[in-house]
């Protein structure tokens, strides 16, 4: 086995020496810059040592620490559900009672924040979606949440132990970290395969029967406990008769026997407004089988299966030179390159999740909890954006620290770098085109609107710009199941169209979402902001090592303020600065997406439904006519939605008014860092230090202004 025993003695001595990982920092502080450098470099293992094995072990060990923190955090969430929540009340009436897991104590009048959440309880309404997740998992009591919270703490302790053990007692050798095929097999078959299989098993044996009874209106306290379903097959057979046959249908290939609890329905459950849980159980079982197969595809101890190095080196087309040759070496020796790819893919996937959470709501009653829908969409969009910017950051660090041009001749990476001017200038042209045209459509509409010429505007009632391709995609997906899945009762998502609206408890869960001129316009703003973000980030990566302006950029490192004295106009060109600028455009892009989603859903989807079947949308369907002008966005969205919060003082909503104000203060504070020069502050500090010297109270550690890069980092964080 490839481990080294007792490589590093366990001791707390280093904890008492801040900066022990760096010769300069270990000397202690001379100026206040020291504390900033300490924070910047503490986790930059690559700057502590060049030994790849040691770096890998530190990262591996840190991952266990990260998992421990996640377990503690989740434990806290579940504990709040067990101790401070109205979960059991919500479970008995999810359409009228709002989820709450936090009660504010009566200190200085804060208890005004506790609103009436229904069911006789007062508290703060939560929008995390955890109640809906717990119901889907089959949790029926606060005691079960309590047990889960304790279990998570035990797992956290286990993770902390593993982190210590695999660094101090049995540390893997470098060869273990570089054994790609074995890692793929274990991650695919173990994490994704057995992980999905165990979840499918839990769903079939615990979640489905409990949810079936809950949907039928059985009191949660009457429902058998999870272990009873697991241990007593007759209980399950009462709900799903085929359970009485055990595994016989599986081995006799008579799988259709199981179609009671492994379904292929499509659409939403009309009782809960969520996906059919029998569909999701089926899905997880299918996914598990795919990944279990995938986990046996790579060549390890037996001479069969794929070798990744061989696949990559064979991968070349007629116009791509050496193709993927050399990439295997990059990905097994540069963890930054590996991380960049993983962040890009995971970030994109997270954004895909954001869009599926509302169009295919996976948990019961999630779709009618509009605040939660909005929160989950916002959360997943932001996380996805951060991960994608992180991908560019680590790709640039790879270029600066790990890229070796001598081993990369005429392969795809080299060829991309050689024609980077063409890539960047074409991308720049695309950004200019998208920016002028998308914004120009709005400006045209504002002008026509101001001049009183509505017949000359781009709108659904005047000059139409219908998103015909999007409508075609919607239509195809609405009709497809008819021929591809004849037994399915509905298409994958209600949003495609063709079906009816789904209403739960007098509220719209989901309906076919109409797309028109307004969506066409804002879609092109999305295209514009995303392309600009990509332009900035990609330029940062492609020019991380050198440029016409600074040919020796690689020697200056990942982050530097300027190319030294006597070279004016070379500031803010480091790879770090590109990440910094890219972040702003990422914020920009995602703000527009969240605005679009928020208004579109309130205008065209969310609302109440009368006994006669009349739908009243929250903002009365005003998106199509109002969002086609900039003025409409400002007046009918930003102001209309913010005014309630701004006027919330003295009500149970006042926390949001204070947060709204506070967030804008923090944002304004960021501008102080972003719009000021370092010299200004250094000058000011020197005057203040002079005064301290006069009074003989000057500190030993000299105060210094933040460096340019530090100031911008503080600024972008507050922004």
Swiss-Prot record:
Gene3D superfamilies to which the protein is assigned, alphabetical: Photosystem I PsaA/PsaB
Enzyme class: oxidoreductase
Membrane-spanning parts: 59-82, 145-168, 184-208, 280-298, 335-358, 374-400, 422-444, 520-538, 578-599, 653-675, 713-719
Keyword Disulfide bond: no
Protein name, entry field: Photosystem I P700 chlorophyll a apoprotein A1
Binding site residues for chlorophyll a': 664
The protein's Enzyme Commission number: 1.97.1.12
Family matches, as PROSITE patterns: PHOTOSYSTEM_I_PSAAB
Organism: Encephalartos lebomboensis
Residues that, per the record, bind phylloquinone: 681
Positions that bind [4Fe-4S] cluster: 562, 571
Keyword Membrane: yes
Keywords: 4Fe-4S, Chlorophyll, Chloroplast, Chromophore, Electron transport, Iron, Iron-sulfur, Magnesium, Membrane, Metal-binding, Oxidoreductase, Photosynthesis, Photosystem I, Plastid, Thylakoid, Transmembrane, Transmembrane helix, Transport
């Amino acid at each position: 086995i490839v481990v080294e025993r007792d490589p590093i003695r366990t001791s707390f001595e280093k904890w008492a020496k801040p900066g022990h990982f760096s010769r300069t920092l270990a000397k202690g502080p001379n100026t206040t810059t020291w504390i900033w450098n300490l924070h910047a470099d503490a986790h930059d293992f690559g700057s502590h040592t060049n030994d790849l094995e040691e770096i890998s072990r530190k990262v591996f060990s840190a991952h266990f620490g990260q998992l421990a923190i996640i377990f503690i955090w989740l434990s806290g969430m579940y504990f709040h559900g067990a101790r401070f929540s109205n979960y059991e009340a919500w479970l008995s009436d999810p359409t009228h009672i709002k989820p709450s897991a936090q009660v504010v104590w009566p200190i200085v009048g804060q208890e005004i924040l506790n609103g009436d959440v229904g069911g006789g309880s007062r508290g703060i309404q939560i929008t995390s979606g955890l109640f809906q997740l717990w119901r889907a998992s089959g949790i029926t009591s606060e005691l079960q949440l309590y047990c889960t919270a304790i279990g998570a703490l035990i797992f956290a302790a286990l993770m902390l132990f593993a982190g210590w053990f695999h660094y101090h007692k049995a540390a893997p050798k470098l060869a273990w970290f570089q054994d790609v095929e074995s890692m793929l097999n274990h991650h695919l078959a173990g994490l994704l395969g057995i992980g999905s299989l165990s979840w499918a098993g839990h769903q079939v044996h615990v979640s489905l029967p409990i949810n079936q009874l809950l949907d039928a209106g059985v009191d949660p306290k009457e429902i058998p406990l999870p272990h009873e379903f697991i241990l007593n097959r007759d209980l399950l057979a009462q709900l799903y008769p085929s359970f009485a046959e055990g595994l016989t249908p599986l081995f006799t290939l008579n799988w259709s026997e199981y179609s009671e609890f492994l379904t292929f329905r499509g659409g939403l459950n009309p009782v809960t407004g969520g996906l059919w849980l029998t569909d999701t159980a089926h899905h997880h079982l299918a996914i598990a089988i795919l990944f279990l197969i995938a986990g046996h595809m790579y060549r390890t101890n037996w001479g069969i299966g794929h070798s990744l190095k061989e696949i990559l080196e064979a991968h070349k087309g007629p116009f791509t030179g050496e193709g993927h040759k050399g990439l295997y070496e990059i990905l097994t020796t540069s963890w930054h390159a590996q991380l960049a790819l993983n962040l890009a893919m995971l970030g994109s996937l997270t954004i895909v999740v954001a869009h599926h959470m509302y169009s295919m709501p996976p948990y019961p009653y999630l779709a009618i909890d509009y605040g939660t829908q909005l929160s989950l969409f916002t959360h997943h969009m932001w996380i996805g954006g951060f991960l994608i910017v992180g991908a560019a950051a680590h790709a640039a660090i790879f270029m600066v620290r790990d890229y070796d041009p001598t081993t990369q001749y005429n392969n795809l990476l080299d060829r991309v770098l050689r024609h980077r001017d063409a890539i960047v200038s074409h991308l720049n042209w695309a950004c200019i085109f998208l920016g002028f045209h998308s914004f120009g459509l709005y400006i045209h509409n504002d002008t026509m609107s101001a001049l009183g010429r509505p017949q000359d505007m781009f709108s659904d009632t005047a000059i139409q710009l219908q998103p015909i391709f999007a409508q075609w995609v919607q239509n195809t997906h609405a009709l497809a199941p008819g021929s591809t899945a004849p037994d399915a009762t509905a298409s994958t998502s209600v949003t495609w169209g063709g079906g009816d609206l789904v209403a739960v408890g007098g509220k719209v869960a989901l309906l076919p979402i109409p797309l028109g001129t307004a969506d066409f316009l804002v879609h092109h703003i999305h295209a514009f902001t995303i392309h600009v973000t990509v332009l900035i980030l990609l330029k940062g990566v492609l020019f991380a090592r050198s440029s016409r302006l600074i040919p020796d950029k690689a020697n200056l490192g990942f982050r530097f303020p300027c190319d030294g004295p006597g070279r004016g106009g070379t500031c803010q060109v480091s790879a770090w600065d590109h990440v910094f600028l890219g972040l702003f455009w990422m914020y920009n892009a995602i703000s527009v997406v969240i605005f679009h989603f928020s208004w579109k859903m309130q205008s065209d989807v969310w609302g109440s439904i009368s006994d006669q079947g009349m739908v009243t949308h929250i903002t009365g369907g005003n998106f199509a006519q109002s969002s086609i002008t900039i003025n409409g966005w400002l007046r009918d969205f930003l102001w209309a939605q913010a005014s309630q919060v701004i006027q919330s003082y003295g009500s149970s909503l006042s926390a949001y008014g204070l947060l709204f104000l506070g967030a804008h203060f923090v944002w304004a504070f960021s501008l102080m860092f972003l719009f000021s020069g370092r010299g200004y502050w250094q000058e000011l500090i020197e005057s203040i230090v002079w005064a301290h010297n006069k009074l003989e109270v000057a500190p030993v550690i000299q105060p210094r202004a933040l460096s340019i890069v530090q100031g911008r980092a503080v600024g972008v964080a507050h922004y």
